[in-house]
Amino acid sequence: MDFLTLFGIYVAVVLTCIALVCKYSGHQQTPLGQLVGAFTRIVSPCIPQWLQSICYRTMHRLFHQRNNFFLYLHLLLEVVVYGEFTYEVFGFCLDMGSSSLSLCVPYILLALKSCLFYLCCSRDPGTLTKSNLSAHLKIYQYDEKLFQQGMKCSTCQLIKPARSKHCRVCNRCVQRFDHHCVWVNNCIGAQNTRYFMLYLLSVCAMAGNIAVLTTDMLLQTVLRTGLLHAHYIDEQGIQQPAGPLFIIQHLFLTFPRIVFMLGFLVFVFFLLAGYCLFHFYLVLVNQTSNEWFKAKGHNCQHCHPYSGHNCRTSYNPFRGFYHRGILKNIGEIFWPLRPVQKKEN
């Protein structure tokens, strides 16, 4: 199996994973999610009904019911990446003169990430109960647009505080609900958003750090073996200089596991970097991803066919309602607002 075939399989697997996440993790409103939905509607008539039924039940189980599948997958991917890094890359880097301190950084990041991962999985996100409901009703004001006073959760039968939402996966209402993360098998809410943000940063740093070390190892290999000045004989028997594609293919055939790992890490890094930037934006404007998606579904009240008033497509009339200034917005993530306790005399 040649390089291009393996690379095509790799790209197909990655795109399939992205499609599944967009389709079944509540991101149908995003452009990518809408594209996946349109593709699904076109392809579904060609798939047998029994196979569609099996796929639907499987995806529903994975993405809409609490389970440990993604926890185990998360740990498996880490074991594979760190196993390959320790088994091959670490030794090559030492032989090529990399410092022991720089090679220890990925393991330090792994320890930090493991602590944050545990906190994300185990800490209560801010579950609303009958006993704490009255206090949580006073934390945030209702904007009467996205969150209206007096609305009751049809499942929990509790009055919904502003910025709260019922998670259909965990079957509970959560204060300042952001989203349900399948990778930590927990909701992200007022009390654990800080851990989730740091967890995202740590995973992004891990992927980036190992990718940089691996790239440096491969570059050193290219320089030391003289591949930049090498030549090869093509199918017509003509001598050709080794270009970038030839060098990449040679590295892939020489270090297949390392190159696959590097491709996976680069993909994870850029995916998480974009996700981190999105959540940092939400932190700065004091908004949750739930509010961001809900606000996109609300049009400006002045926009109707005969008004002559047209807002930009990115117009969001509710973005600033809970905005308290950048520093206070950041502080609200790391020191969540809590109900005021009345002192008893």
From Swiss-Prot:
User: What transmembrane ranges does the database entry give?
Assistant: 4-26, 69-89, 101-121, 195-215, 258-278
**Chief location of this protein?**
endoplasmic reticulum
| Domain DHHC intervals | 151-201
Q: Which domain of life is it from?
A: Eukaryota
A cellular component term, taken from the record's GO annotations:
plasma membrane
Coiled-coil stretches noted in the UniProt entry, renumbered to this chain: none
Catalysed reaction(s)? Answer: L-cysteinyl-[protein] + hexadecanoyl-CoA = S-hexadecanoyl-L-cysteinyl-[protein] + CoA
**UniProt KW Cell membrane keyword:** yes
Kindly state which keywords UniProt assigns to this record, in alphabetical order. Acyltransferase, Cell membrane, Endoplasmic reticulum, Golgi apparatus, Lipoprotein, Membrane, Palmitate, Transferase, Transmembrane, Transmembrane helix
Annotated catalytic residues = C181
- What EC identifiers does the entry list? 2.3.1.225
Give the enzyme class.
transferase
Which GO BP terms apply? protein targeting to membrane
Q: Which residues lie on this side of the membrane: Cytoplasmic?
A: 27-68, 122-194, 279-345
Q: Tell me, what is one Gene Ontology molecular-function annotation carried by this entry? A: protein-cysteine S-palmitoyltransferase activity
Q: Motif Di-lysine motif — list its residue ranges.
A: 342-345
Residues on Lumenal side:
1-3, 90-100, 216-257
Q: Where in the cell is it found?
A: Endoplasmic reticulum membrane; Golgi apparatus membrane; Cell membrane
Membrane association type = Multi-pass membrane protein
> Record's domain comment?
The C-terminal di-lysine motif confers endoplasmic reticulum localization.
Sum up the protein's function in the record's words: Palmitoyltransferase that could catalyze the addition of palmitate onto protein substrates.
Provide the family line.
Belongs to the DHHC palmitoyltransferase family.
The protein here is known as: Palmitoyltransferase ZDHHC4
Species whose genome carries this gene: Danio rerio (Zebrafish)
